[in-house]
């Protein structure tokens, strides 16, 4: 009786082994190519942004995604929707993922500062002067250079009828560029300058410009502090068939390339995304880096 029962057990075991081998073979055939396409990386960077509705932050995320395609670096991104408590949670969550370097554009809050202090890794702080000393490296666009260069470009062509598009009050980059632009004007030029609040994105800028142009017809030059807000103002002018203005702006190359139509004059910045990845990788490898980095002309 025992020998008779052993044979079915042996057959069951043999069948199980054959099924396993067949399963492995089919898996390789079906999924082998997918596995081969998965790219490994040596450095993992965590990025915490206040909000992506800010044109500069949205552009930075896209730039980073593009730059990492050909590099041995991966970036995990989170945005806080303008909420400082959410940013604190984002920072802690990114740290729990085991990132090697943290990149943070901080919301003005002591809670955020405390969350940064708790990190046990290199930290790159972006574009908030109040947090200059909060991380390993502070990085920002050279707003003084950009603001002055933009004003000089415009004043070479126009002495009056200048409209400056003011961005969100919560955007430190926009505020710094505006201050540099205005500071480079003479007293008379400052008095004749018109400033229009246009919000933080293209749609808000277009709406603000439409209302403005209905009752204002003496503008000759429009100065934008980001590509998207300038483009919004341009669209409003086109829809109202106002073709008597010149449009001047500043931004990085990738943001500018998104605008395919229209005649614009640009101050072009180098890529912050590339610099973030370069510095992040150097910090990960334990190399010495500059404590303050300004992104200037392309």
Residue ranges of each PLM-predicted region?
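N-terminal Sec-pathway targeting helices
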Residues: 2-17
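Hinge/cleft segment of the Venus flytrap/periplasmic-binding protein
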Residues: 13-14, 25-35, 185, 269-298
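Short beta-strand segments enriched in small/hydrophobic residues
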Residues: 30-60, 136-137, 161-170
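Extracytoplasmic "Venus flytrap"
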Residues: 44-63, 76-84, 106-107, 169-175, ...
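An alpha-beta-alpha
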Residues: 45, 64, 148-196, 280, ...
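Hydrophobic alpha-helical
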Residues: 92, 101-119, 181, 194, ...
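Flexible loop/hinge segments that line or gate small-molecule binding clefts
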Residues: 107-148, 252-261
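Hydrophobic alpha-helical segments within soluble ligand-binding/sensing domains
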Residues: 137-163, 176, 204-206, 252-256, ...
């Amino acid at each position: 009786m025992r020998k008779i029962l052993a044979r079915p057990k042996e057959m069951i075991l043999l069948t199980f082994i054959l099924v396993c081998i067949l399963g492995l073979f089919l898996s390789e055939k079906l999924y082998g190519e997918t596995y081969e396409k998965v790219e490994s990386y040596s450095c993992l960077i965590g990025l915490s942004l206040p909000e992506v509705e800010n044109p500069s932050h949205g552009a930075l995320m896209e730039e980073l995604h593009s730059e990492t395609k050909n590099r041995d670096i991966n970036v995990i991104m989170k945005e806080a929707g303008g909420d400082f408590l959410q940013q604190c949670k984002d920072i802690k969550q990114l740290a729990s993922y085991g990132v090697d370097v943290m990149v943070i554009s901080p919301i003005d809050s002591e809670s955020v500062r405390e969350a940064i202090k708790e990190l046990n890794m290199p930290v790159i702080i972006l574009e908030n002067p109040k947090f200059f000393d909060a991380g390993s490296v502070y990085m920002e666009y050279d707003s003084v250079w950009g603001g002055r260069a933009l004003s000089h470009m415009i004043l070479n062509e126009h002495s009056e009828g200048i409209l400056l598009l003011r961005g969100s009050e919560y955007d430190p980059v926009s505020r710094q560029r505006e201050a540099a632009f205005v500071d480079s004007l003479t007293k008379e030029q400052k008095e004749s300058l018109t400033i229009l609040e246009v919000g933080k994105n293209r749609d808000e800028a277009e709406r603000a410009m439409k209302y403005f142009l209905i009752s204002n017809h003496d503008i000759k030059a429009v100065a934008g502090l980001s590509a998207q807000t300038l483009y919004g103002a341009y669209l409003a002018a086109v829809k109202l068939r106002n073709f008597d203005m010149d449009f001047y702006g500043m931004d990085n190359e990738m943001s500018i390339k998104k605008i395919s139509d229209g005649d614009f004059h640009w101050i072009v910045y180098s890529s912050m995304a590339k610099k973030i990845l370069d510095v992040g990788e150097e910090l990960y490898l334990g190399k010495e880096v500059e404590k303050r980095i300004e992104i200037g002309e392309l």
